[in-house]
Amino acid sequence: MDLYYGSYRALRSISLEIPANRVTALIGPSGCGKSSFLRCLNRMNDLIPGARVEGTITLDGADIYAPGVDVVALRRRVGMVFQRPNPFPMSIYDNVAYGPRIHGERRKAVLDEIVEQSLRGAALWDEVKDRLHRSALGLSGGQQQRLCIARSLAVKPEVLLMDEPASALDPISTAKIEELIRELRAQYSIVIVTHNMQQAARISDYTAFFLSGELIEHGPTGTIFTNPKDQRTEDYITGRFG
């Protein structure tokens, strides 16, 4: 697939398979196209004037850019967690229940169950169970990011996209997010953009290296980090440029 912003070709001839129930890390220097590629996977680039995708991106064999695709339904299946925590200015409970309510769920007992299971899934329940109806803005940065993950889990996605989810967090919060990602891959396919080579090596099963809008190399993380085929991959991983 190719991505254009107007006449500018931001991504060139990208061909990449994302394995199910694995963590795939997208690495590369700033401006290489990895975040642009991530946003293609749930059509977030649709929100940018002049952006268009040529080629196909399939989820379970169906082209997500085909005419008539319900983009809201797609984004329910392919959730996204952004670089900086973005909780809504409402209670912790209402943040998590927001998605299910948008999709028509009104039964309190069902919402209660979704909220608890989503917060448990994001390893946050024990920290907030006694203050569910307090503002989410009172949480720490790391807690807010886990709340945003819980909010994504609440609509039962198949894929989770994460755009540098720990870059704005302290080391302890980052470690919790990384541990959570390792746990979540048993149930979800995860694609994560990261500038942190050590983080990519720790948490991912597969790694894809982007440079100047091209996919240079991808494969099992151990292979990419210890025996890359392309000299540019080795130069980036070893810090010769970036």
From Swiss-Prot:
Localization in the cell: Cell membrane
Keyword hit for ATP-binding: yes
Enzyme class: translocase
Pfam families: ABC_tran
Cross-referenced InterPro entries: AAA+_ATPase, ABC_transporter-like_ATP-bd, ABC_transporter-like_CS, P-loop_NTPase, PstB-like
All residue ranges annotated as the ABC transporter domain in the record: 1-237
Binding site for ATP: 28-35
PROSITE patterns the record matches: ABC_TRANSPORTER_1, ABC_TRANSPORTER_2, PSTB
Matching CDD domains: ABC_PstB_phosphate_transporter (cd03260)
Predominant location: membrane
Listed SMART domains: AAA
Catalytic activity: phosphate(out) + ATP + H2O = ADP + 2 phosphate(in) + H(+)
Gene3D superfamilies (UniProt xref): P-loop containing nucleotide triphosphate hydrolases
Keywords, alphabetical: ATP-binding, Cell membrane, Membrane, Nucleotide-binding, Phosphate transport, Translocase, Transport
Enzyme Commission number(s) from the entry: 7.3.2.1
Family indicated by similarity: Belongs to the ABC transporter superfamily. Phosphate importer (TC 3.A.1.7) family.
Assembly behavior: The complex is composed of two ATP-binding proteins (PstB), two transmembrane proteins (PstC and PstA) and a solute-binding protein (PstS).
Reported function: Part of the ABC transporter complex PstSACB involved in phosphate import. Responsible for energy coupling to the transport system.
Protein name in UniProt: Phosphate import ATP-binding protein PstB 1
Upper classification of the organism: Bacteria, Bacillati, Bacillota, Clostridia, Eubacteriales
